[in-house]
């Protein structure tokens, strides 16, 4: 990482993972915010740390774009992650949380990089195409499909150069089915 230009110590890892090592990392005074993905024990530990924490289950990882981020780079990384193999990899970001102070700039950059924001009038039909609402899980039909194919199934017309599809949500959980894992370029 340092050879690629990152500052010394910017990228670190725990060579032998354990809950004790993870707890020590979360308790470290140099850690301001925790992003926890994995089993319920990991998420509960993060929420109990006394620090701001974002917790998700296995395979439903969010990304957070903080106010000081390099917006162009952050958006590029997310578009690459979600468009590689049409987002089939469970480690690809399933959602993005954006600091409100840079929201408009991030949205413009996503659009500049080919992202299509699903219009509010199309949201219900898009949601029911992407998520099996009865089972509250991804519709297997859309897994690994192109943005063009998913939009076509939803009855939405998108530009030919669309890289990913974005649905703006105001929350997460059962009331927001699109906040679930999607395994697609959504």
Predicted segments with their positions:
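Conserved glycine-rich beta-strand-loop-beta hairpin in the small C-terminal domain of fold type I
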Residues: 179-186
């Amino acid at each position: 990482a340092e050879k690629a230009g990152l500052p010394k110590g910017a990228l670190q890892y725990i060579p032998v993972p354990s809950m004790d090592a993870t707890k020590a990392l979360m308790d470290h005074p140099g850690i301001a915010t925790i992003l926890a993905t994995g089993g319920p024990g990991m998420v509960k530990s993060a929420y109990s740390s006394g620090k701001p924490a974002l917790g998700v289950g296995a395979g439903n990882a969010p990304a957070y774009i903080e106010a000081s981020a390099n917006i162009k780079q952050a958006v590029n990384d997310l578009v690459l992650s979600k468009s590689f193999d049409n987002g089939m990899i469970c480690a690809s970001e399933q959602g993005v949380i954006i600091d409100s102070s840079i929201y408009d700039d991030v949205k413009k950059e996503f659009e500049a990089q080919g992202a299509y924001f699903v219009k509010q009038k199309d949201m219900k039909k898009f949601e029911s195409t992407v998520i099996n609402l009865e089972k509250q899980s991804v519709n297997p039909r859309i897994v690994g499909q192109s943005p063009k194919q998913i939009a076509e199934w939803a009855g939405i017309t998108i530009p030919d150069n669309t890289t990913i599809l974005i649905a703006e949500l105001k929350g997460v959980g059962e009331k927001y089915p699109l906040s679930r894992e999607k395994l697609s370029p959504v």
